[in-house]
Structures are given as C-alpha cells and as structure tokens.
Amino acid sequence: MNTINKYSKTITQDETQPAAQAMLYGIGLTEADMYKAQVGIVSTGYEGNTCNMHLNDLAKDVKFGVASENLVGLIFNTIGVSDGISNGTDGMRFSLVSRDIIADSIETVVSAQWYDAVLAVVGCDKNMPGSVMAMGRLNRPAIMIYGGSIHSGKWKGESLNIVSAFEALGKKFNNTITPEDFKGVIKNACPGAGACGGMYTANTMASAIEALGMSLPYSSSNPALSQEKKQECLDAGKAIRVLLEKDIKPKDIMTKKAFENAMTMVVVLGGSTNAVLHLIAMAHSVDIELTLQDFQKTSNNIPVLADLKPSGKYLMEDLHAVGGVPAVMKYLLENKLLHGDCLTVTGKTVAENLANIPSLHQGQTVFLPLKTPLKATGHLQILYGNLAPEGSVAKISGNEGDFFEGKAKVYNDEYTVIDGVKNGEVASGDVVVIRYCGPKGGPGMPEMLKPTSAIMGAGLGKNVALITDGRFSGGTHGFVVGHITPEAYDGGTIALVKDGDTITINTKNNTIQLKVSEEELTKRKSEWKQPKLKATKGVLYKYAQCVSSASKGCVTDN
C-alpha cells in the first residue's frame, strides 16, 4: 500500500526532529496524529473584497472534512489582490504579480512544512492560476476549491454585476444616467460574498481548471453562499484521501490533453483573454509547452455556445441553474469535443465523472446547441503583424465585426484615456493605443477594464477599437486587442505608433498592422529610447527583472 505520509513523516517520525515534534504537540496534535498524513489547506481569504471575504470560513469546512478522513488538516493563508478594487489605479500593477507571489508562497510553505497534500480555497482572478501553478511545481496530491460566484445585484428591477458599476462611469460622462441611478448601481451591484458573476476571469479560470481536472465536479459553478459549495468543501477531505492513497499527483492530471480540455472550455464559454496567460503559465509549472498557436487551433475548431456576460445575457448562477459546468462538459464529451480519458482529482477520468451527471435542462437558453452557436469559431483570436510580430490576443465575441481600420489615438498609460473619453478626445473611428503597460513596462501588465468600460459606457463601443501591451479584464467587451508582444518597453512596434497613424485589425486573417513604411519605422526605432523602469525597488522592480513576455505566460521562473 502507498505510504500517504511520505513527506510529513520526515518531521513527525524522525527522532532527530524533536523540536519540530514539540511544536506539533504544542498546536494540539496527539501521538496518533503523528502517524497521519498532513494536508496543507491554503486560503486566500481576507476581508477586503467580496470574492475572498468568505474563504476562511470555507477553509474551516475543508478542515473538518479532512479530519473526518483521519488526516491532519493545517490551515495557512496567502495573499490576494482584488482586481475590482485596484482596476484603474496603480494598484492594478500588483494584480498579475500576485499570481506568482501566491504560487511562490504556497510552494514555500508546503515544501518547508513537509505537507503531504494541498487543498487550496481560492476566489479572485489570480488566486486560481497561482494556486494551480504551485500544485504543479510541488507535484503532490492537490485539489483546488473555488470559492464560487456572487449572486446578481438588483436596482429598479434591473439585474446588476460588477461591470454594471464600471460602465456606469461612461454613462455618467455621456449624461445617460441620473445621479440617483449612478449611486444606486454602485451600492447594489455586489450584494455579498462571491467572485464576479459573469464569465469574467475568475469564473473563466474556475471553469477551465474544472475541465483540466484539478477541481471537483461543480466546483466552478456552485454559488459562493450555497449549500452545494459548503458540501463540496466538506467532501474535499474524502477526495484528497483518494489521491493520497492512489498517489495521483498534478503531473498525472495536468497533461497536454487535459490542457486541450481546459482551452476548449474557455472558448465554448466565451471566457477571458487572461486564460491565455494563465494556462500557459500553469502548463509551464508541469513542464508542458502550451503556445499561442494552441489557443488559435482551439478557436478554429470550437464555437462559442454560452450566452454569458460580458458579451451575452447571463451570469454563472444562471448556468448553474440549468446544469452547471459538468452538464456543459457532458454535452461537449457527447459531441466528441472533450478528451474523456483524462484523469481528474476524483481519481476517475472525465468520462467516468460525467457518466451519471444530469444533462443540460431541456429548453434552456444559457448554453446553445452546436447547430445554433453564438459564434461559429472561437472568440479568442491570435493576431500577428508588424504591430505584434510575437503575437497578440483579441477577444472578438461576434458583436464587433471582424475588421476595423482607424486612426491611432496614443496614450502612454491607461489613466489619461479616461480623461480622453470624458473630454471628447476619443471619437468614432479611433484606435486607442495604450502602451508601456506590459509585464516590464507597467510593471505588472495592468488590466484596461476602466478605459474599455468608459468607452462602452460612453456609447463608443461599436465604433472605437483599443489595443494595448497590457491586459484586459474578463469583464471587457468591444473590439479589443491585448498582450501585444514585444511590449513597448522592449522597443516593440507599439512604442513607435504616433497619433494619426492608420491601424488595421483583421480577425479573419489574424493580422494587426500599422500602415507605416518600413523606412519610417526604421527611422522611428533609431530615435526611440527605452524609458527608465517605473519601479526602482520592491516587488514590482523584482518582477520586471525576471518576468517573461505575455506570449510566454508572464512566468517568473523561466
């Protein structure tokens, strides 16, 4: 039989470790506990945002379930950054950085404490990939437990979510919302605990990780405050014991085929562009090369079927009500769009997990059949051209068309764009260029939700495109292209764009072009000087020194 405490016994059963054992007795462990496997339960819980405010309570449920399986569960915490709070401020530069800090800190604690397994209770956007990256590096039995989605808010009969609050600002600029309604939307958009409710980054990553096999069935769609979520947490102990006994580790689960399942889920649900960065980084943690071309191949073959916000009508709670992510996976498997033989954290394969799962409800309109897709091919399009010779990522829902040509309106940060929208600088037909916001130039590759929301709220969404070497929130919609590489800080072509230049974006042939002669670009490049890093010490400075490009997942351990 497999020894399930093969790591912790180094501390608990070695007579040359008396001080370590004294400390463990000091926290309340018994003689019998010294022979049990130890499970590190990491929570990204903190009081500062709705996505994470309930996670420490869920971690206690997880600990109870672990103890019920004759295992020792020990809770520890790591950081979280709220994208919703930091968006549009300098704080957003710490968001992507937090993903790698989360991964590093979980790896550090589990390795130093000699835990035999890991259960991660996570909420906001970067929590999920950060925890799974750590699991991949550690390669010990592990399960991710998603904190679940928030319920929708309500104001004057209208359903609200976090993007309603962001877009209210653009409506205010455009004088299409009253002061009372502006305040009403803000006060009611987030009615309690849970991650942002649309198919934004948190729900995208939770769904992708469930399809990957690293979370239990329904984890991604069980609402935050539901009895189902509590039961999932209680059941995690039984599941982690199975993984310990069978010695099933992340590298057994996170295979190339499993990542193909995850990419399929991202596309079919119309998920966030951030999934490109995060899945590449997660694959890197288990020594699998995932590329931009893998995402394009998926988009070429998989349609968008879920009518979910930000581009569609519904929220994750609506998808859960008609069957949830497992029912979606069952539909995809029945139509030969998923690999059913991939192993998962249940100890069973995808196909085995789905065998007795109820199908999507008859007559529901949240997830459409293959014969009537929202978009016949994927919304994530990888674009190349003289503006992005190493690639970029466009999010094209189908509402924007597939071609845009316009005059560049250049900004060297995201803040001045807001003033540009407010003051009428940004006009119909413009291509807004936001640069020096890449992994190094930011530093931290901030999201552009505030500028895109201002553009949408001002009624310019169908007539203005936006391109950047930064990122987009999962809540962004419109004609947008991000992750442009090389970034401006590294002297990429985006650094050479001038106001009035013509930019062409063609998602049919996957190109993004600056219509400027090679001679002129060579002249501009010779005159360009690399700016000083915006950070001169601390975590952002360290990040800028070691981060890879967006096309490589912005990893910091390569």
Curated annotation (Swiss-Prot):
It catalyses: (2R)-2,3-dihydroxy-3-methylbutanoate = 3-methyl-2-oxobutanoate + H2O; (2R,3R)-2,3-dihydroxy-3-methylpentanoate = (S)-3-methyl-2-oxopentanoate + H2O. GO terms for biological process: isoleucine biosynthetic process; L-valine biosynthetic process. It is an enzyme of class 4 (lyase). Keywords: 2Fe-2S, Amino-acid biosynthesis, Branched-chain amino acid biosynthesis, Iron, Iron-sulfur, Lyase, Magnesium, Metal-binding. The active site is at residue 473. Its EC number is 4.2.1.9. The modification N6-carboxylysine is found at residue 126. It comes from the Bacteria. Mg(2+) binds at residues 83, 125-126, 447. Binds 1 [2Fe-2S] cluster per subunit. This cluster acts as a Lewis acid cofactor. Its cofactor is [2Fe-2S] cluster; Mg(2+). Pathway: Amino-acid biosynthesis; L-isoleucine biosynthesis; L-isoleucine from 2-oxobutanoate: step 3/4; Amino-acid biosynthesis; L-valine biosynthesis; L-valine from pyruvate: step 3/4. GO terms for molecular function: 2 iron, 2 sulfur cluster binding; dihydroxy-acid dehydratase activity; magnesium ion binding. Signal peptide: none annotated. [2Fe-2S] cluster binds at residues 51, 124, 196. The keyword Iron-sulfur applies. Functions in the biosynthesis of branched-chain amino acids. Catalyzes the dehydration of (2R,3R)-2,3-dihydroxy-3-methylpentanoate (2,3-dihydroxy-3-methylvalerate) into 2-oxo-3-methylpentanoate (2-oxo-3-methylvalerate) and of (2R)-2,3-dihydroxy-3-methylbutanoate (2,3-dihydroxyisovalerate) into 2-oxo-3-methylbutanoate (2-oxoisovalerate), the penultimate precursor to L-isoleucine and L-valine, respectively. Belongs to the IlvD/Edd family. Homodimer. This is Dihydroxy-acid dehydratase.
